[in-house]
Amino acid sequence: MTKKKYLMSSAQMTIIAAVQEEAVVQGSRILRSAFIVVASVIYLVAPSAHAQVQNNAGGAGQSPRTPWGDPDLQGLWNNATITPLQRPESLGDKAFLTAEEAAAMEQRAAEGFSQANTPREVRTEPLPVGGDVGAYNSFWTEEGTAVVQTGRTSLISDPPNGQLPQLTAEAEARIASPAYRRLADVRDGRVPADGPEEMGLSERCLWYRGIGHISPTGYNNNYHFFQTPDALVILQEHIHDVRYIFLDGRPHLPSSIRQFAGDSRGRWDGETLVVETTNVREPFIRRWNLPQHSLGRGDLSDQVLLVERFTRTGPDTLNYEFTVNDPNTWTKPWTGSLPMARTDGPMFEFACHEGNHGLMNIMAGSRAEDAR
């Protein structure tokens, strides 16, 4: 089918990209980021064509189709799950759970969430000055309640043992360095930050991910997919990150141009959209996106290549597979699989924005302490 330009009726899709520059401020290198509008892409879709997007279920063995004939990935998808990234050692070589084991795991998770919601104490008097008032309970989180639909014991499918590959000697040295350990300690709350330079971009409400990897978090696990003949746009609920993936065959950016989420290019391989992401900015992912947060133990380098595969496997399911290849970090590539489920939404605003008051108030409180 010949591809044509279609427009989404009465809608304008504004694409936001993140660029960053390095600046030298009093001898310290800091990352400054600015969100700029790089494009406003408008496509017209006649009402009948829009209805076709919703109703065209495709032929036998085919996923739903867009008016221009590509598999239709559009919609609001959720990937919350209690399945861990790595297989628990207690499961050995067991790759899949039985139905009974999956039900038992989900029951244990439900009991854990219920217990976490139980008040630890009921206070009638204020705490002494400096007392711990606690934090969010599981009412405020959305970690998922079920194992992945495939019943896998881990999101990692390769290596077959469900574990991350061995780190290279170079990676071991990186994560053992004092600078790395310092940032990890600040991130994990073991020590306070010395200044704003040690606060991550997610705490500034600027950016959450260092690469395009879609993995479940503690909450806000929704992703809104928008699709045109030439692009796929993914709006992530968490810190409202936006990925713009070109599908028009253009080459990757020159290796000298590095971006927060790297540079993504997509192509169709039958029913599957294959996306390759390169050009990740190494200082960013090291300082502000230490990968234990989403990828397990390790430290990505600027040589990382991320290959993602999106496949509609049913009216309400989208399979997401990813392969991480970083020869400077792991001794071999590794692959994970994460089925996503359609959700009706709506996806609410993530009310976190650049220039919010959190960091300013933290700094003001710290300076007040210094002045005592």
Predicted regions and their residues:
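N-terminal secretory signal peptides that target proteins for export/translocation
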Residues: 1-31
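Bacterial N-terminal signal peptides
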Residues: 12-14, 34-46
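PEST-like low-complexity, intrinsically disordered acidic/proline/serine-rich tracts
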Residues: 2, 6, 27, 35, ...
